[in-house]
Amino acid sequence: MRSLTLILGLLAGVLLANPPSSTMKVVFSDDFNGDALDETKWTYDGNKECISLKGGKLIISLKQRPDGWQGSAVSTRNKFTQVQGYFEASIRYNGNKGHHGAFVVKNLEKTEPPAAALYYECFGEDKLVPWARLADNRGVRDVHPPKNGLNLTPGLVTKKFNTYGILWNDRGFAWYFNDRQILKMDKLDVKEPMLLHLGNWVSDFEVKDLVASKLPDDVEVDWVKIYK
């Protein structure tokens, strides 16, 4: 059985090894310094009205519609994918409950098993959850770390930008926070390329906790880099 192994707490201990990017080359990047989203790099995976650029940052907002609250996302779908490598972004996550920010490295939805989706999700109030959804000949299953989250200093991921990274190599998958490896998973024989997805979503299970008076509560992305 494949499992996620917690390497260290975000504020406890230091991994002395260099980050994966130190031995790789950048093959995709965006610093969001333009006037509009660069559609040669990104595909809208939701409502375009929720996506904007401001002050050199990608802003992913929520929008109220007659049928409820709607989030959105952008991804490199149909623009950039690769087999293995290191996917990295500088993100400030949402501060409140009722919706969740997402940094995801995944295969296309119609990819035949084995396939994977590797997540960093923040459910507000500094609840950051790294996890994986795997598909193989045994079916689809979700794999979560112990306690289904990480112990964080209040405001660490919701008031500051931090660097989130996901590594995919021959040995498996690993999650990095500010260049420190915090989680790893042993090998799944995924062969198809993966894309990068950045989102701010409202799911049915959490919408009851969404408080309109606390909006806007955007997810902001300062930059993205993908290495090979």
Regions found by a protein language model. Name each.
Residues 18-228:
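GH16 jelly-roll
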Residues 5-14:
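Bacterial N-terminal signal peptides
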